[in-house]
From Swiss-Prot:
Pfam families: Abhydrolase_1
Subunit structure: Homodimer.
Chemical reaction(s) catalysed: L-homoserine + succinyl-CoA = O-succinyl-L-homoserine + CoA
Localization in the cell: Cytoplasm
Record carries keyword Transferase: yes
Function: Transfers a succinyl group from succinyl-CoA to L-homoserine, forming succinyl-L-homoserine.
NCBIfam families the UniProt entry points to: homoserO_Ac_trn (TIGR01392), PRK00175.1 (NF001209)
Primary localization: cytoplasm
Listed GO CC annotations: cytoplasm
Gene that produces this protein: metXS
Lineage: Bacteria, Pseudomonadati, Pseudomonadota, Acidithiobacillia, Acidithiobacillales
Protein name, per record: Homoserine O-succinyltransferase
């Protein structure tokens, strides 16, 4: 918890909620009988309502992108390093909005929410949701906030996929699209990682076919394993070598057993056990499926340039050299497709050793690229 809030922080923030009562038609063919979104805002919306930027979060992220909910918080929001007064995403120039997407578990409607027809949690009766569905709800949130056009839509990882979907589905509603550490679709290997994670959850004896809420339990072992597997893919080999090497826990000798010997084992177990306390297992299943299904080019016979042909936004695409989950090669696919359809696109490959999680870190070159680009956006709109 902070002794005092840093001057360059957005400070104390309060989540807000909005409930939409009209049925939401989903890409899977089903619908939700209304839904709730939880979101946060940072900065001030100008009189012209032209300085709004939408932030799209990743798999385990949420609406809390920066600042603190109380002085008791152990740590600030997930993009604290980049979002705040005078930072790369400058709250003195822009008004930022970040919403928890449906299917998640941080306040927006998801599997743990109450099904109005049964009075019990949805569980696996919750309909499948997709990136396109998330973008649709974000557009409804923009309408609610009176924002006709975003100055930019920005997102990393799964958030970057939402940015791409925004540019295709609502081309007239964003001026700039910032796609960070993302891919135009998952590879077979990435789908395989997600499936192993899902199986870890679904084969846990405490899963109860997704109805573990009624049993006052949760699939702790399965969700913990899923997080451990996922976390390995977010880090590079060099990052793990630098952080852990083959160091034993506390420098002790081998136990010659199956308890924790190495620091990296201790780290992964901590990541797994702490994740269980803050995330819902069913949400993890739904979100990873949405990741798997994302493939906007499939509508166009696999031609990504055709998928981008209707876009109007200017693009900034950023990748990280050590990211093997969504490698620079995947970002270059996006850039090439945008070039092919004559879109304005800037590209930066950032040298970083942190792997996929680099998009969350204050790497100087990354900060400079983002700050310069958004600075030009601010000048363009007179912010």
């Amino acid at each position: 918890m902070p002794v005092e809030i840093p001057a360059d922080s957005v400070g104390l923030v309060t989540p807000q909620t909005v409930t939409f009562s009209a049925p939401l038609e989903l890409e899977c063919g089903r619908s939700l009988p209304g839904y709730t979104l939880t979101y946060e805002t940072y900065g001030t919306l100008n009189a012209q309502r032209s300085n709004a930027i939408l932030l799209c979060h990743a798999l385990s992220g949420d609406h809390h992108a920066a600042g603190y909910h109380s002085m008791d918080d152990r740590k600030p929001g997930w993009w604290e390093h980049l979002l705040g007064p005078g930072k790369a995403m400058d709250t003195e120039r822009f008004f930022f909005v970040c919403a928890n997407f449906i299917g998640s578990c941080k306040g927006s409607t998801g599997p743990a929410s109450t099904n109005p027809e049964t009075g019990a949690p949805w569980g696996l009766d919750f309909p499948m949701v997709t990136v396109r569905d998330w973008v649709k709800t974000q557009a409804e949130l923009a309408d609610y906030l009176g924002i006709e056009q975003w100055a930019a839509v920005v997102g990393g990882s799964l958030g970057g996929m939402q940015v791409m979907q925004w540019s295709m589905d609502y081309p007239e509603r964003l001026r700039h699209a910032v796609v960070i550490a993302a891919a135009p679709k998952l590879t077979a290997q990435n789908i395989a990682f997600n499936e192993v994670c899902r199986q870890a959850i679904m084969t846990d004896p405490e899963f109860y076919n997704g109805r573990y809420y009624a049993h006052n339990t949760k699939p702790r072992r399965g969700l913990s394993l899923a997080r451990m597997i996922g976390h390995i893919t977010y880090l590079s080999d060099n990052a793990m070598r630098t952080k852990f090497g083959r160091d034993t826990r506390g420098g002790k000798a081998f136990s010659f057993g199956f308890d924790v010997d190495f620091e990296v084992e201790s780290y992964l177990r901590y990541q797994g056990s702490s994740f269980v306390e803050r995330f819902d297992a069913n949400s993890y299943l739904y979100i990873t499926k949405a990741l798997d299904y994302f493939d906007p080019a499939s509508t166009w016979g696999g031609n990504l340039a055709e998928a981008f042909a209707s876009t109007r936004a200017n693009f900034l695409v950023i990748s990280f050299s050590s990211d093997w989950r969504f490698s620079p090669e995947r970002s270059r696919e996006i850039v090439q497709a945008l070039y092919t359809c004559n879109r304005d696109v800037s590209y930066a490959e950032i040298e970083a050793e942190h792997g996929h999680d680099s998009f969350l870190m204050p790497i100087p070159q990354y900060v400079a690229v983002l700050s310069t680009y958004l600075g030009r956006v601010a000048e363009e709109i007179g912010a």
